Amino acid sequence: MVLLKRWLRVIAIIGLIATILAPTTAQAASKTVSKVPARAAYVMDANSGQVLYQQNADKRYPIASLSKLLTVYLTVKAINEGKLSWDEEVTMPSNLLKLSHSYAYSSLQMKAGEKFTVKQLVAAAMIASSNSAATELGEIVAGNNAKFIALMNQQSEDWGLEAHFISSSGLDNSDLKDFDLVLPDTGKNEQNLVSAKAITKVAQQLLKADPDITKIASQTEASINGTKIFNENSCLPGKSQYKKDSGIDGLKTGYTENAKLCFTATYTVNGQRMVATILGGDTTFSAMNKLIKQLKQKYSLETTPLTAQRIALANGLATTVTATPMASQAGVWYQDKTTSLETKVETKLTPAQLSSGTVNVGDPVAQATVTDTQTGTAQQITYRADQTATLFAERVVFTAKSTTDQLLTALKQPVASLF
């Protein structure tokens, strides 16, 4: 009996230890990120560029309609540069009308003579993934299809991306041949080939160029000239794969037989805008939800607030300007440690500002660098001027009769104004 009691006591102790250790074991397991069941994946903080996950991230793969992200970026860039307006109206050429009526490649049928604004075409490309809309955007921006594809490849090269484009829509040459959209000197089955890292960075640049693009991409349906269009992003609210904890509000889906399912998602965690891409999967939406959940369990965010402040426009000069940061906070992701952040704000004037001697409202004037002192990971946030300022005062001419007060006043001015 005594021996039995001892054994029961041992068993009870073992059970108690197991109970105590169980949560720790579960917590450790929850911080593991499973391999994504797809060809490639990439996740980054859109504000800082910090990478949270990558899988075959630099290898080029077909990306289908994710290609439209670069098409829309270049459209927004042209608008921001004043070369194009959201309200500009166009009618569709005959080959794109034909494409819009193709059962296999169309999500929005268009009529001869029907007018579309640039904003409507962007909505059609982002929400319904309209191939005709995307192709027309390219022709509006560059003048014709071939010139726009060249612009896409030049932009990719400028950003150092692993990418090569032959279409603005994401369709392959085998699809484009019936619509007079195949570029000269390209193969009959050639297609856009882009890495997961590359298209994620394109999405990052699009968010910077137009932070409101998610207001378009998050719409599950919309109406264009009385025709309803629908979003294939199943992770949006009200859709079959929607998960509140994921918080996905965009951005673009894609599918061709060669590319399989592709998805670039946008979501926010603790105020930080995130971008995640999965290429070439069969269950991309559920895989994206799982990836986001696991990354939230693995990483924590250390943030520091950023507020408006006076920025000295040059070292040692009295000229200052009030500037506002482009984000209310900066943050660094970390795991299994306590981090320490250091913030440094530096004046950053452009050659054009220095040449003209003027800073205008909205101009970038400084850059905050928030650094994790333990890992060196850093995030940079731009400060933009809230007011106009003159860098250089009127030139001062010294004579033998210059008074002491005049000399002292001049010494308080920028050095460049003294000569």
Set out the residue ranges of the language-model regions:
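A short hydrophobic/aromatic micro-motif that marks alpha-helical segments and, especially, helix-coil
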Residues: 20, 83, 145, 224-225
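Active-site-adjacent loops and short helices of periplasmic peptidoglycan-processing enzymes
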Residues: 26-197, 207
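Structural motif marking the loop-to-transmembrane transition
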Residues: 4-8, 63, 114, 118, ...
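Domain-terminus/edge residues, biased toward the C-terminal soluble/receptor-binding domains
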Residues: 187-419
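Sec-dependent N-terminal signal peptides of Gram-positive bacterial secreted proteins and lipoproteins
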Residues: 2-28, 419
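Residue-level preference for short coil/turn positions at secondary-structure junctions
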Residues: 12, 37, 361-364
